[in-house]
């Protein structure tokens, strides 16, 4: 079992298939990017340790397929999350329009104790594509959406060149830490359950 000084934080990344969820994870955790696209099957996760003030935290970052047939991963996947990261592609309007559906999906499945104040963070990814000339979702539009959802944090990112990825995940971690209950729990059951039930996955995604 983990030391009492170490806390597990479960982060869920949601968004349509192809928006770059896996690549954002890999850029943050491994500082790597692959141009080869392989869709995530089911769900997968990466971990990274962070220090905040005098405490150590392990971020367990979960990535989903983003496809309709995998949206039934269910309660075991969503429950126990400390922060939810909603992700879209700034060059694909449909991925932005899906954000409300993903947010509702999370709130229904995770059933947080205080849904009105549960921490979400929004990432607008792939700002590097074609030098930004192909984007169809403006920063203003994205920020207006965030404002309508309680002024949640927003970052424009590139998993390919790393723009704002570190900053975004530092914010995600901070929000997750602030959301943790006063009594520290290490969610050992969550780790075991995820490890024994999650589907096999293939994860190497374009940004």
From Swiss-Prot:
Pfam families membership: Ras (PF00071)
Keywords: Cell membrane, GTP-binding, Lipoprotein, Membrane, Methylation, Nucleotide-binding, Prenylation, Protein transport, Transport
Lipid-acceptor residues (S-geranylgeranyl cysteine): 205, 207
Single GO biological process annotation from the record: protein transport
Membrane topology recorded in Swiss-Prot or TrEMBL: Lipid-anchor
Record carries keyword DNA damage: no
TM regions (residue ranges): none
Localisation per UniProt entry: Cell membrane
InterPro entries, A to Z: P-loop_NTPase (IPR027417), Small_GTP-bd (IPR005225), Small_GTPase (IPR001806)
Residues involved in GTP binding: 15-22, 63-67, 125-128
Disulfide bonds: none
Molecular function via GO: GTP binding; GTPase activity
Residues where Cysteine methyl ester is found: 207
GO cellular component: plasma membrane; vacuolar membrane
Protein task: Protein transport. Probably involved in vesicular traffic.
Family stated for the protein in its record: Belongs to the small GTPase superfamily. Rab family.
Name this protein carries in UniProt: Ras-related protein Rab7A
Origin organism lineage: Eukaryota, Viridiplantae, Streptophyta, Embryophyta, Tracheophyta
